[in-house]
Amino acid sequence: MPKIEVYSSRYCPYCARAKNLLKKKGAEFIEIDVDQNPKERIVMERRAEGSTSVPQICFDGKLIGGSDELVALDMSGKLDELLISKGK
């Protein structure tokens, strides 16, 4: 399984949607709360090329985007491929 990092905020509905989808797929992920960890927000913004919106989701260090991009990957079947190809 890839190392999945989800930069999120506590009251963000898009973050909840992304995390729920990953949980539904049985994927383990590291949640990084950028509200509680301001230094992590800076890291997220660098990784996301300046984007300040959450969630920002990384698979094995590669940014895939936010909730909409994660859902699009799921709808196309590519999310399952990513999870399976990494040994899920």
Predicted regions and their residues:
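Short, glycine/charged-enriched secondary-structure capping and boundary segments
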Residues: 20-22, 45, 71-73
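Thioredoxin-like thiol-disulfide oxidoreductase module
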Residues: 34-51, 78-84
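Local sequence-structure signature of Cys/Sec-based thiol-disulfide redox active-site neighborhoods
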Residues: 1-28
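Structural micro-motif
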Residues: 49-58, 68
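Anionic group-transfer/hydrolysis microenvironments
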Residues: 7, 35, 62
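Residues that form or flank phosphate/diphosphate-binding pockets in enzymes
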Residues: 16, 39, 65
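Non-catalytic, surface beta->alpha helical segment in thiol-disulfide oxidoreductase systems
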Residues: 59-86
